[in-house]
Amino acid sequence: MSLDKLVYMANQIGKFFDSQGREQAAAGTADHIKKFWDPRMRAQILAHLQAGGEGLDPVARTALERVKAAEKRKPEQLNN
């Protein structure tokens, strides 16, 4: 999938949860990405985040930082 599409999707998910407040929106976005995104999609967007994350909204950026931290802790649980 194209990087532009992944950035768009992450931002859209963040906007969906945005009415819950920034902290809850980031948590909801991270949870969605961990549960429903293919591992290859997560790897691609996390590499983009590592390279600066151009185009990512603040909620999506915070959510992806959480996904990144979760993958470092328990990578086997993200694929379930």
Regions found by a protein language model. Name each.
Residues 1-80:
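Intrinsically disordered, low-complexity, basic-enriched segments
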